[in-house]
A protein has these predicted regions:
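Conserved beta-strand hairpin/beta-sheet module of binuclear metal-dependent hydrolase folds
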Residues: 1-58, 197-222
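C-terminal regulatory/interaction regions
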Residues: 11, 263-267, 281-284, 289-310
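Active-site environment of divalent metal-dependent phosphoester hydrolases
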Residues: 11-13, 67-73, 104-108, 221-225, ...
Length: 310
């Protein structure tokens, strides 16, 4: 069977997908636990991940949906990064293919973990291997041209919204990933808003002819989701927004439902109401990394209680 694991890390995101054929995809890595604090209920994410990997020291795909700390904390301490020797060796976990939105390559003025991961993304993109960049804004072509690289030579590393990611397919892996966002316009402005330009995908798993669908939505806001729904329905691709499990956007923030925060409930826009109330299928589970800690009625986000897809 395939397994999807959500981890109890509070207002942050990490999701590990383990396929029946042994391949893995990790969406974000945010080790938020305060070391040494016995009262911190968040899990030791590095330990949990290493326990899942066992003797393996490489993950097929590691996706950083965007470069906010609550999606990449301690990544540079845990993963082997190709661009600098100080991030290599020891028992660091290797990344076969890194998935990032174009904003992770283009954003300027970043610091800390974000700067390190941006440097790694740029290095892999310029080298032409080990990376997939989502969306193709004009600024990405300009980035390459300034470094004397013909953009046409990197087209195979770029996936546009509305297309499948080539690293996995249903026939051989029992899963396919459909990219909904970011759109090129999200990554083409002078000021990049990370949440708006984050990676939003639908994973379709198949076992013995039965499909299970998962939506991973990062921290996108209601306007971005509204656009995704509008474009998907216009193209008659409603099935690409069906879901059995959905990772609640932005750690359950009201801003991922509608423009105004309600006193008890936030009213969704019409398109979001359609997504959440009509597109959920038989299994219908909502996942939040903070659910286990806060007692919310979502699927428990614990590595010892994974969602088995069969």
């Amino acid at each position: 069977v395939h397994t999807v694991r959500f981890f109890p890390i509070g207002n942050a995101d990490t999701c590990l997908i383990e396929l029946a054929n042994g391949r893995r995809a990790l969406f974000d890595f945010a080790d938020m636990r305060e070391s040494g604090n016995v009262n911190d209920k968040r899990c030791d994410l590095e330990k949990e991940l290493r326990d899942c990997l066992g003797d393996d020291k490489e993950i097929d795909v590691v996706a950083f949906t965007h470069l906010d700390t609550d999606h990449c904390k301690r990544a540079k301490e845990v993963f082997h990064l190709d661009h600098a020797a100080k991030y290599q060796g020891g028992d660091r976990i290797k990344i076969k293919t890194m998935w990032v939105p174009a904003s992770a390559v283009l954003e300027e003025g970043v610091t800390g973990q974000a700067r390190t991961l941006r440097t790694e993304a740029r290095h892999r993109f310029l080298e032409g291997k080990g990376i997939r960049v989502f969306s193709r804004p004009d600024a990405l072509d300009d980035f390459l041209k300034k470094r004397n690289i013909d953009p046409a030579t990197r087209r195979n590393l770029i996936t546009d919204a509305g297309t499948l990611c080539p690293e996995f397919n249903l026939e051989h892996d029992g899963v396919e990933f459909f990219a909904h966002s970011p759109f090129a316009e999200h990554c083409d402005g002078e000021v990049i808003v990370r949440n708006d330009s984050a990676l939003f995908v639908q994973a379709t798993f198949e076992v013995a002819g039965r499909q299970t669908k998962l939506i991973l939505s990062a921290d996108v806001d209601y306007e971005t989701i509204d656009s995704i729904v509008r474009i998907t329905r216009r193209n008659q691709n409603d099935h690409r927004l069906e879901w059995d499990i959905i990772n609640v956007p932005h750690h359950s923030s009201y801003n991922s439902l509608g423009p105004e925060k309600g006193n008890n409930e936030t009213a969704p826009t019409d398109n979001l109401k359609w997504l959440y109330e009509e597109q959920g299928r038989a299994l219908v589970q909502l996942a939040s990394a903070g659910a286990l800690l806060l007692g919310r009625r979502f699927v428990k986000a614990a590595s010892h209680a994974p969602q088995r897809l069969c």
